[in-house]
Design a protein with these regions (language model features):
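Short Gly/Pro-enriched loop/turn and capping motifs at secondary-structure junctions
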Residues: 176-178, 190-192, 210-212
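Short intrinsically disordered coil segments
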Residues: 186-189, 222-223
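Short, gly/Ser/Thr-rich active-site loops of penicillin-recognizing serine hydrolases
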Residues: 137, 141, 151, 156-159, ...
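Short, well-ordered beta-strand elements
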Residues: 201-210, 214
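Short, surface-exposed loop or secondary-structure junction motifs
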Residues: 1-184
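Active-site-proximal beta-strand/loop segments in catalytic clefts of secreted hydrolases
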Residues: 1, 187-188, 207-209
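Short, surface-exposed beta-strand/loop micro-motifs that present aromatic residues
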Residues: 183, 190-203
């Protein structure tokens, strides 16, 4: 929910190897006084969660996600460490790394590689459609129950009522224009997002790139929000037309 108020700083982060960075995360962060009261987006929580899962399953994050999510869903084109870089579109022309293609843009995930719980997934619209359908089917896909129905219901409830804005578990919220019921929403740093409306059985998968060839963050965010507002407005209008007699 990004309300742990994680406090910490890792100097020379990008110069460390994977084990050094993992040790630094495990010993450099602690919860602050505003825990549960303020939403501050940080990927430190998902990185630490990844380390916890590795301890529980005694596998790397890539192995955990591949065996329990990607392969059972049939997301055969999705991976964290692509072997054929030409299958991946360029991400950014970076000052230090040159043209980033087929390796994660995120500097922490770039160092952590198979141990990263915060970033680095390469996918396409066909595979992401399978992932989204699992959510729309309340956790089920092709007779395999990935998430309990109760878990999907739980995701649609504000998990931090004492905080300054609502959040779900791992997801942000957007809201239906007419009813103000919550929709699951998540963005990726490079310009992607997912918007899932479980009740209306619809979703918006947006695959774009805001950092290549140039990064115009503010312009992108403004235009993205306009696109979302238009989509939600038109979606609500279509729904009203379909339900009116």
């Amino acid at each position: 929910t990004h309300t742990a108020d994680l406090q910490g700083y890792i100097p020379n982060r990008d110069q460390m190897n994977a084990q050094e960075l993992k040790d630094a995360y495990n010993h450099s962060f602690h919860a602050g006084k505003a825990i549960g009261k303020k939403v501050v987006y940080t990927d430190a929580g998902t990185i630490l969660l990844g380390f916890m899962l590795e301890e529980m399953f005694q596998q790397s994050m890539i192995e955990i996600l591949s065996e329990r999510v990607l392969l059972p869903l049939g997301m055969n084109e999705s991976t964290f460490l692509p072997k054929n870089l030409l299958n991946c579109v360029p991400t950014e022309l970076h000052e230090q790394r040159g043209l980033i293609r087929g390796t994660t843009h995120d500097p922490k995930a770039f160092v952590l590689r198979e141990h990263a719980g915060n970033a680095g997934l390469f996918s396409n619209v066909y595979d992401l459609t399978k992932f989204v359908r699992m959510y729309l089917n309340r956790g089920s896909y092709h007779n395999h129950q990935f998430l309990k129905k109760e878990t999907i219901d739980l995701l649609l409830v504000n998990q931090v009522p004492a905080a300054d804005k609502p959040r779900s578990l791992g997801w942000d919220f957007k809201y239906d224009v007419a009813t103000q019921r919550p929709l699951l929403f998540h963005t990726g740093y490079t310009g992607t997002f997912l918007l899932i409306d479980v009740q209306k059985q619809s979703a918006f998968i947006f695959l774009s790139n805001r950092v290549h060839p140039e990064d115009h963050r503010n312009t992108y965010i403004e235009e993205r929000d306009q696109l979302l507002a238009t989509y939600l407005k038109e979606k609500s209008s279509v729904s009203d037309e379909m339900t009116s007699f």
